[in-house]
Amino acid sequence: MADITTEELEELENEVVSKDDNIKTMQEFVSPESLYQELIASVKKYHPSTDISLIEKAYKTADTAHKGQVRKSGEAYIIHPLCVAIILAELELDKETIVAGLLHDVVEDTVMTVEEIASEFSEEIALLVDGVTKLGQLSYDADKVEVQAENLRKMFLAMAKDIRVILIKLADRLHNMRTLKYMTPEKQKEKARETMDIYAPIAQRLGISKIKIELDDLSLKYLEPEAYYDLVEKVALRKSVRDDYVQSLVKEVSKHIENAGIKAQIDGRAKHFFSIYKKMVNQHKTLDQIYDLFAIRIIVDNVKDCYAALGVIHEMYKPIPGRFKDYIAMPKPNMYQSLHTTPVSYTHLRAHETRSNL
């Protein structure tokens, strides 16, 4: 890897967990009260009329229960449940889930009982907290083969009678991964492997791509640090910058597709580090041989429009030879049908892949 200063590495590292990505980077020793206000603002954003009194009660209860406890970072323990609750609010979950997120560690780490939670809050919230506590008791052996990891994932899902229990556990793991740097190197690798093998796949199964992507990238950071930082350095652009670039492409493509009279839904994304790394490993390629660091998806109603959209793209950008795939003429075994092409973009940034799907 080329020479790079510590300051530059830290700046590049922040692109994975960035406020620009609407993912909160919690500064060390941040005020619990400021985080609480952030939580309330987040809840009010998607549920303006919600009664916050129960959330406030849960915050005060958790703060009292965890009084005197500190995390490995040295910050007050209450910071963790607050951050978990904020992640849940970003998923726009109901008030009861937010409350359970604030209380999720009180049974395991304090003298408070499930019965007391049921009495002071509700049976519903008590069951959520109890479910999270029981999931935390599942142990994972990183040396297990994949089939055993899959069995543990199934057990994880089966034990949670309420899907909200899993969502709280995912939020809990995400914040723990964001603050993993305070653990020993051995514990970092252990937690990262468990996250990649168990938690990220579960997030994917539940369709929570935002959490799945961040869990993957954070796991890669600790499991393969050289590869991770090499990607961070070589990709060179903050995710916010890459996302802005993709959105500019989406806007440009949308204009041309509309002018062609094609009805379509168009979106795009910048591929995350783990996705790029996995492709490099599986296909035995270097980063310079990975052409699709960006992807734009065009969804149309019929085959005719699919080919027409492809024609529009090829008029806009020159296609890279050998990168066109016709899954309409030859569908995948699961009957997936689309057209894939990789054109050269009009800026200095790397090429992007465009998919026109039925």
Please provide the spans of the model-predicted regions:
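Active-site helical microenvironments for divalent-metal-assisted chemistry
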Residues: 2-350, 356
